[in-house]
Structure formats: C-alpha cells, structure tokens
UniProtKB/Swiss-Prot annotation:
InterPro entries associated with the record: Cysteine_desulfuration_SufE, Fe-S_metab-assoc_dom
Broad class of the protein's primary localization: cytoplasm
SUPFAM superfamilies: SufE/NifU (SSF82649)
UniProt-recorded name of the protein: Cysteine desulfuration protein SufE
Amino acid sequence: MALLPDKEKLLRNFLRCANWEEKYLYIIELGQRLPELRDEDKSPQNSIQGCQSQVWIVMRQNAQGIIELQGDSDAAIVKGLIAVVFILYDQMTPQDIVNFDVRPWFEKMALTQHLTPSRSQGLEAMIRAIRAKAAALS
C-alpha cells in the first residue's frame, strides 16, 4: 500500500480535481498503482459476486493482526475503486473494518452519485464482501 495515498491525501487529491473526467482518471491511476495479483489468487473463493466486472479481493491478516488487502479487476475504473476501498481500510484490524463506515468518505468525495448504478452496486458488493471476511476473522 506504500504506493497509495492515505485517506486524507486521497480526499485532498480527489477534491483538487477540476471535474469528473479528472476524478475518473485519478481513480484509474490509483488502480494502476495496485500490486499485481497472482494468477492463483484469481480464484472463485476470492471472486466478488454482484460486480458487473470480474473482481477478486484477497484478505490476509499479518502477525500484528492488521488486515492486508490485495485485489484486481478486468475493468480499469473498477480496479481504481478497489484501490479507493483499500485506502479507506488501510492498517485496520478485522474489528476496525467491521466498525468502520466508508459511506461518509464516499459522500465527502461525492463518489457514488457519479457512478453508474451497476458500478455503485459493485462497490457495495466489494464493501460487503470485505466486511463479511473481516467479521469472520474478528
């Protein structure tokens, strides 16, 4: 996650974009910064149902109890949305993830109102899947 900004910098950078085209390009750029997901991690158990695009999210807990997320998608904008979600959940324990509400951050970014309904549903599916996996670990 070192290549990605923290939550506050994400919000600042997003709000600096002059228009929605710039914001979409920034989201795509964030997705390009995600580390490559191994082919063996692109498996059915890591696949997120409810997304129009193919999405894989891998969740591992490190020795300190912090969740490490990895993900990929076959769509550039969706891969960027994965990066945004990962930034919001960065350095959290499973219980932190379960308790943390990402929606106020999306509202500050005015993100969801500029996504198509299918992208918004996919974003919600990613969040539900991450929270469910975190709940199983907590």
